[in-house]
Regions:
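Binuclear metal-dependent hydrolase catalytic cores
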Residues: 1-162
C-alpha cells in the first residue's frame, strides 16, 4: 500500500516537533523523500517511523531555506557513511533546481569530511531539474514545476499515486 508519511510540519520555527519534510512510500516499500527539515532531527524522525536511511535513494529538495535544506546535509553524511561501510546499495539521487546544486555541494564541502564529499557526483548524484521537466522516480512519473515564490526560488512537483 502506498503511503504519504509526514515527518514534520510546515512551520520553520517549531521547537516541540520537527519541521518541513515528508516521504512517499510506494507499494514495493521504496521511498521518495521530499525535503529533509532543518537538521539532524531528520534522523530521529526516520527512526521513529522505522524508515532506514539505507532504503532512501530518491530525494527532492524544494528550495534553500534552512528548514528544508539543513537536514539534507545530515542525509548526505549518513548515506555517505553507509556507502563507505558497504551498507548502502546503489546511488542516492537528490533532485533540486539548478541553482541549488552548487549551494548544496558548497555546504557539504564546508561541513563534511572529504571521503563523504568525494561521493558527490559518483554515488550521491545532485540532479538539477527544470520547470516542466518530467522524471521517472520509483514507479511514478514526476513533473517538476517552479512555484514562482517571491521569497526564494522554489520548486514543487506533481505525481499520481497508483
Amino acid at each position: 500500500m502506498e503511503k504519504l508519511i509526514v515527518l514534520g510540519t510546515g512551520n520553520a520555527s517549531v521547537t516541540k516537533c520537527y519541521n518541513t519534510c515528508s516521504i512517499i512510500q510506494d507499494e514495493k516499500g521504496k521511498y521518495f523523500m521530499i525535503d529533509a527539515g532543518g537538521g539532524n532531527g531528520i534522523l530521529t524522525q526516520l527512526e521513529k517511523m522505522n524508515i532506514p536511511v539505507t532504503e532512501i535513494h530518491d530525494i527532492f529538495l524544494t528550495h534553500e531555506h534552512t528548514d528544508h535544506l539543513l537536514g539534507m546535509i545530515w542525509m548526505i553524511r549518513v548515506i555517505g557513511q553507509a556507502i563507505q561501510k558497504g551498507k548502502y546499495e546503489g546511488n542516492c539521487t537528490i533532485y533540486c533546481h539548478d541553482g541549488l546544486v552548487n549551494v548544496l555541494k558548497t555546504i557539504c564541502e564546508l561541513t563534511l569530511v572529504k571521503k563523504i564529499t568525494n561521493l558527490i557526483g559518483d554515488r550521491i548524484i545532485l540532479c538539477p531539474v527544470q520547470d516542466g521537466e518530467e522524471k521517472q522516480i520509483l514507479d511514478y512519473k514526476v513533473k517538476f514545476f517552479y512555484i514562482r515564490s517571491t521569497k526564494a526560488r522554489q520548486f514543487g512537483f506533481l505525481t499520481t499515486l497508483n
